[in-house]
Design a protein with these regions (language model features):
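Bacterial N-terminal signal peptides that target proteins for export
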Residues: 1-9
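Bacterial N-terminal signal peptides
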Residues: 8-17
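Boundary at the C-terminal end of the N-terminal hydrophobic targeting segment
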Residues: 20-24
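C-terminal, non-catalytic "cap/extension" segments appended to globular domains
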Residues: 27-305, 333, 337-410, 582-697
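Auxiliary, metal-adjacent structural segments of Zn-dependent hydrolase domains
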Residues: 409-473
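Flexible, glycine/threonine-enriched loop-and-boundary segments that flank and lead into catalytic domains
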Residues: 453-462, 482, 611-624
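Active-site recognition of the HExxH zinc-binding catalytic motif
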Residues: 477-508, 530
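Post-HExxH zinc-binding segment in Zn-dependent metallohydrolases
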Residues: 506-559, 636
Length: 697
């Protein structure tokens, strides 16, 4: 997962009064367009033309109209508005260019400094540095950027930007963007910053809601040695503590290489189902002092000790289920996001902002791409191949089948031994980054350059990549390393996060303007990270790709895209449901999530797996703490395959990765056209999967 500017834990009960009160704040009066404004716009525009000449009319009309669109009555009367226009409209092209460069440089310092404050405030909650205290949660829930938008409209900087640089629609970017220079793109991105005027209190409440959800997810671990099967036997090693959903899913995948892994896979799937349905006993979450039989759903005091934690004196071991906390956190993010809706007339829902503004890919197009993968005839053919390789009928958890990967030749214990020996600490992984990068095809000079711009921290959660926001700062790779070293799951995730960090470094340090920093949307950085992650065994010296292994890798990509497309579709349908039922309770949201997960499963997965009403598509943690993040993953799989084909054509991952990352934040299709020669879509992956099937069969 990639984080650039992350928006602690308020309980849902504590959050609701704040949200309810704030929801009344955007009054009709405060959002209404002042009655005098149209006449003032005409007068201010005419005055500019009279002063500077007819040549600036078109630019003046657009700039004044843009400024007026976000002017509020509290900003001042007609005389004040016209004064702001006279003061801040720039007629001279050279002066306008100078102002743009100053704005770009100063916004970099602003973004970077606030970003570093935010990172520091979240240090204790994000990193594995001991217990989280209430003061840590309070700092983590504070957003230092919350007042910037308010302040910059109040001090007229935002209006200066709107008067001089064009607010462009997505249609305009798609139509005209291919002809724009890098500076024109940067000017458009600068103006995009001020396309909405969300009040500071709303921005802060959104940040607090997501921080609360993130803290909940980051602490949601299961102690696996304390899971008991129907015979009361322990199936997992002592000390194994897995975070939901990432480590649970990856442990399930790891069991494909174990001869006796099937019972453990079934048990993990049962644990996942208990989490999604919230029938999991609350006492077992991140608790090594309780034994749990997930099939019978019974709990008892732990009969073994595999933790250095003291037993809490007041702990009561009860089977009472988790009280819909998972869905209370999700509902908290939804209610917070709704507060921004009145201030976003062009994108009046979180759904519209997620797709139209952030991804710049329409929701309908994304859904069509997901459905194209989910309904492909290739799914049944690949499923039959998996079934034949397993020698048994498919079970629902086989959506995570990973037997196409060469790692299937190694047990998880063998891989853990290698990675723990190689990376006993986060510092050891950091020291190995230059070797990893040269192994991926980067020159020694570029590998050294990148390693100098990346630092490694011990993650409290599964791990994430937090890029820098100004030149001079470093990207942070957060990875989970246990007392005995980095296990294979951690290494695989760390490579993914390293891919993010490398992209983040190139797309910050090596773009011509700060306003162009980044990639088109998060799916692109996920795609680039997948390219790193897929080379894990090769980097460990355990596998060399040949034609057959590459074909199997393509089938693995396809099966992964199939699985995550279903998960993403559940995420999208769930947000639509919340908007249709804004007064829902956590219990009602739980019921809706289960219904949507089952319906999506029955539509696309049951015909393949032969079992209905499965809820596993609802297990992903990002569904709770990242607000419509999940569609980035299937889009990322599609993009990743297009990138891999381009790398295969040229033969050098390092050179191509750098070339692509340095394009900056263009629109998705333009970025992809310049990177690979084709727009974003599943076509390349589907065609490659069909060819791979022919080769493997």
């Amino acid at each position: 997962m990639s984080t650039r500017l992350l928006a602690g834990a308020l309980t849902f009960a504590a959050l609701l009064p704040i949200i309810t009160h704030a929801a009344t704040s955007p009054t009709t009066a405060s959002l209404a367009r002042p009655a005098w404004l149209d006449a003032s716009v005409a007068k201010a525009t005419a005055d500019l033309v009279a002063t500077h000449g007819e040549a600036i009319r078109s630019r003046a009309e657009r700039g004044v109209r843009q400024a007026a669109s976000l002017w509020r009555a509290e900003d001042g009367d007609a005389a004040v508005f016209e004064g702001v226009v006279r003061t801040h409209f720039i007629a001279d092209p050279a002066t306008r260019d100078t102002v743009f460069r100053r704005l770009d440089a100063l916004h970099e310092q602003l973004d970077g400094s606030l970003h570093e404050i935010n990172r520091a405030f979240r240090w204790q909650t994000d990193l594995d540095l001991g217990p989280i205290l209430p003061i840590d949660e309070a700092f983590a829930g504070y957003d230092p950027t919350a007042h910037v938008n308010d302040d910059f409209f109040a001090n007229r900087i935002a209006f200066a930007v709107l008067l001089n640089f064009p607010l462009t629609t997505l249609d305009e970017k798609l139509r005209d963007g291919p002809k724009w220079s890098p500076q024109q793109w940067a000017e458009a991105r600068l103006a995009d910053r001020y396309a909405r005027r969300v009040p500071a209190d709303v921005a802060q409440q959104i940040a607090s809601a997501y921080s609360s959800a993130d803290n909940y997810i980051s602490s949601y671990n299961v102690w696996m040695h304390h899971l008991l099967d129907e015979r009361g036997q322990r199936q997992f090693p002592a000390g194994q503590r897995l975070i939901t959903h990432w480590n649970l899913r990856d442990e399930l995948k790891a069991q494909y290489s174990a001869k006796d892994g099937l019972p453990r896979q079934r048990m993990i799937a049962q644990v996942m189902e208990r989490i999604v349905t919230q029938s999991i006993p609350a006492v077992v979450v991140d608790n090594p002092h309780v034994d749990w039989q997930p099939y019978a759903n019974t709990v008892a005091p732990a009969a073994v000790n595999d933790s250095d934690r003291a037993v809490p004196t007041a702990m009561k071991i009860l089977a009472d289920r988790e009280p819909d906390t998972r869905y209370a956190r999700l509902l908290g993010t939804f209610q917070a996001e709704r507060l921004a809706d009145p201030y976003s007339p062009a994108a009046p829902t979180r759904i519209a902002r997620s797709f139209d503004d952030e991804r710049e890919l329409p929701e309908a197009r994304v859904e069509a791409m997901l459905v194209e993968v989910l309904s492909s005839p290739l799914v049944r053919r690949v499923a039959k191949l998996i079934e034949s390789r397993l020698g048994r009928p498919l079970e629902p958890f086989d959506i995570w089948y990973n037997g196409f990967r060469p790692r299937g030749a190694y047990t998880e214990a063998q891989l853990d031994e290698i990675t723990r020996r190689k990376n006993p600490t986060p510092a050891a992984f950091a020291a190995d980054i230059p070797n990893i990068l040269t192994g991926l095809g980067f020159s020694p000079q570029r590998a050294k350059y990148l390693a100098e711009h990346i630092t490694v921290d011990p993650a409290r959660g599964a791990g994430h990549a937090w890029g820098a926001a100004r030149r001079g700062d470093k990207a942070h790779l957060r990875t989970r390393v246990g007392p005995s070293g980095m296990d294979y799951k951690g290494y695989n995730i760390a490579l993914h996060e390293l891919g993010h960090n490398v992209e983040q470094t190139f797309s910050l340090y090596d773009v011509p303007f700060h306003s162009l920093e980044g990639v088109p949307n998060t799916a692109f950085t996920e795609a680039l990270a997948f390219v790193f992650q897929d080379r894990d065994l090769e980097l460990l010296g355990l596998a060399r790709p040949d034609a057959r292994s590459e074909a199997l890798g393509t089938l693995d990509d396809f099966w992964g895209a199939f699985e995550i497309s279903g998960v993403a579709l559940v995420d999208m349908r769930l947000w639509r449901w919340m908007y249709a039922h804004p007064a829902a309770t956590p219990a009602e949201l739980r019921a809706a999530t289960l219904q949507i997960a089952r319906q999506t499963w029955n539509e696309f997965f049951a015909p393949v797996f032969g079992r209905k009403d499965v809820v596993l598509l609802g297990i992903y943690s990002h569904m709770i703490d990242r607000g419509l993040y999940l569609p980035n993953y299937p889009i990322g799989h599609m993009i990743a395959h297009q990138i891999k084909e381009q790398v295969h054509r040229t033969g050098n991952l390092g050179t191509e990765f750098e070339r692509m990352s340095r394009q900056g934040r263009l629109t998705p299709d333009l970025w992809m056209q310049r990177a690979t020669g084709a727009p974003v879509g599943p076509g390349a992956l589907l065609a490659a999967a069909e060819a791979a099937l022919e080769q493997v069969q």
